[in-house]
From Swiss-Prot:
It catalyses: [protein]-L-isoaspartate + S-adenosyl-L-methionine = [protein]-L-isoaspartate alpha-methyl ester + S-adenosyl-L-homocysteine. It is found in: Cytoplasm. GO terms for molecular function: protein-L-isoaspartate (D-aspartate) O-methyltransferase activity. This is Protein-L-isoaspartate O-methyltransferase. The active site is at 60. The gene is pcm. Its EC number is 2.1.1.77. Catalyzes the methyl esterification of L-isoaspartyl residues in peptides and proteins that result from spontaneous decomposition of normal L-aspartyl and L-asparaginyl residues. It plays a role in the repair and/or degradation of damaged proteins. Transmembrane segments: none annotated. Belongs to the methyltransferase superfamily. L-isoaspartyl/D-aspartyl protein methyltransferase family. It holds the Pfam family PCMT. GO terms for biological process: methylation; protein modification process; protein repair. Keywords: Cytoplasm, Methyltransferase, S-adenosyl-L-methionine, Transferase.
Length: 209
């Protein structure tokens, strides 16, 4: 397997950083990250770093992908929404873990590229949409888990409304200083847990690109 040594080394790094869920680790190990980045960065594919993917966006560092995926507490039957398809890498990881993934991307060029990559990997349990991530995907909800791959300045209420009872929202919140949060729905109440400081590109609402 190409990059086999690099993939193994990355798994060791993720475990050292506290990623413990074997299913999540196996999902990350099974996705060829080099397919989701520009060829110029392919030599960095299995380094624990974020990398540019164009349009002012990035592919998250593998640790953050692992951490956010763990926090979703997924089962195979989990109904999952991803806000911010980006390169499609996080989408591909989720697709290893659940029966179906719904993913929204506001930048058409990124959505198209992600669809092409996911098809190349024969991942057919994914539905993508060009749309405003702040609004979620109302007619496909409610969702057991929602993951947001860009930072919101404030909590998107429409996403909270699309959670099932007991559903989890994992989202970075803040402007310059951002905190990764896990929000769990309990009836009409929402329990918020601060996880750690992070740095993401901003979650842009409104007009599509």
């Amino acid at each position: 397997m190409r990059y086999a040594k690099e993939r193994h080394n990355l798994m060791v790094i993720l475990q050292r950083h506290g990623i413990r869920n074997e299913k999540v680790l196996n999902a990350i190990a099974s996705v060829p990250r080099e397919l989701f980045i520009d060829e110029a960065f392919s030599h960095q594919a299995y380094e624990n770093n974020a990398l540019p993917i164009g349009s002012g966006q990035t592919i998250s560092q593998p640790y953050i992908v692992g951490k956010m995926t763990e926090l979703l507490e997924l089962t195979a039957q989990s109904h999952v929404l991803e806000v911010g398809t980006g390169s499609g890498y996080q989408t591909a990881v989720l697709a290893q873990l659940v029966d179906h993934v719904y993913s929204v991307e506001r930048i058409k060029a990124l959505q198209w590229q992600a669809k092409r990559r996911l098809k190349q990997l024969n991942l057919h349990n994914i539905s993508t949409k060009h749309g405003d991530g702040w609004k979620g995907w109302h007619n496909k909800g409610p969702f057991d888990a929602i993951i947001v791959t860009a930072a919101a300045e404030e909590m998107p209420m429409e996403l909270l409304a699309q959670l099932t009872d007991g559903g989890r929202l994992v989202i970075p919140v803040g402007d310059d200083l951002q905190v990764l949060k896990k929000i769990t729905r309990n009836g009409e109440q929402f329990v918020s847990q601060d996880i750690e400081a992070v740095r993401f590109v901003p979650l842009v609402a409104g007009d599509l690109a």
